[in-house]
């Protein structure tokens, strides 16, 4: 079982690394045609304006602004429920999450959490976007479910379409930051409007107009 778990981890990391590498070339990146994601790219610019126009010194650098763009767009995805499937969230921000003060460059991707040792790993897919994974402890005579160890008892593995989308967002955040920083007074300029056309046309270069609209906010 442990060998199988190691093989699965290796496979997931290989897929993630491959997708991240492929997305470095935006022209070759494959974007999941999900209308919720398209609308999220449009409406997420309000978060960009709110969180990334503070005038912080960290935002004056390309890496800092890119990280803030990515963080604010991901917050938008969560808050608007665009990452939900069957009322379950694909990923959840930490409790008490606040706008970041970027200091480091944007990571290539956010890896999935490690599989607990001595456990049985199982996944099943309930849609084309997400797979639900569970771990069952293999400790003799106890077989404790991970809801006693990891809180929820399951973790939503970032299935390939979502991972691709987040990877492209990461690449486009860097491109948007690079372009926006060439504008005068970037800290006080209407960053949301400035980055809107840049960011959306980067994510959906051949059909940015289809991303217009408003996202329904889910409780």
Curated annotation (Swiss-Prot):
Swiss-Prot/TrEMBL induction comment: During nodulation in legume roots after Rhizobium infection.
UniProt keyword annotations, A-Z: Nodulation, Signal
Pfam families to which the protein is assigned, alphabetical: Nodulin (PF02451)
The organism's place on the tree of life at top rank: Eukaryota
Alphabetical list of InterPro entries matching this protein: Nodulin
Signal peptide start and end residues: 1-20
GO biological process: nodulation
Family named by the database record: Belongs to the nodulin 20 family.
Name this polypeptide is given: Nodulin-26B
Organism: Glycine max
Lineage: Eukaryota, Viridiplantae, Streptophyta, Embryophyta, Tracheophyta
């Amino acid at each position: 079982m442990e060998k199988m778990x190691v093989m699965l981890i290796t496979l997931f990391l290989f897929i993630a690394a491959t997708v991240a590498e492929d997305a470095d070339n935006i022209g070759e990146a494959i974007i999941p045609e999900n209308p919720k994601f398209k609308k999220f790219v449009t409406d997420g610019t309000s978060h960009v304006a709110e969180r990334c126009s503070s005038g912080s010194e960290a935002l004056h650098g390309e890496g800092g602004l890119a990280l803030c763009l990515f963080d604010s767009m991901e917050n938008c995805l969560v808050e608007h429920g665009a990452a939900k499937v069957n009322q379950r969230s694909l990923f959840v921000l930490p409790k008490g999450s606040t706008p970041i003060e970027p200091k480091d460059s944007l990571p290539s991707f956010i890896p999935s959490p490690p599989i607990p040792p001595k456990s049985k790993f199982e996944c099943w897919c309930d849609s084309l976007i997400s797979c639900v994974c569970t771990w069952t402890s293999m400790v003799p005579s106890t077989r404790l479910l991970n809801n006693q160890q990891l809180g929820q008892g399951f973790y939503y593995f970032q299935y390939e379409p979502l991972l691709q989308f987040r990877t492209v967002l990461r690449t486009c955040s860097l491109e948007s930051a690079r372009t926006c920083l060439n504008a005068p007074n970037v800290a006080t300029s209407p960053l949301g409007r400035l980055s809107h056309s840049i960011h959306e046309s980067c994510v959906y270069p051949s059909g940015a107009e289809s991303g217009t609209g408003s996202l329904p906010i889910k409780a």
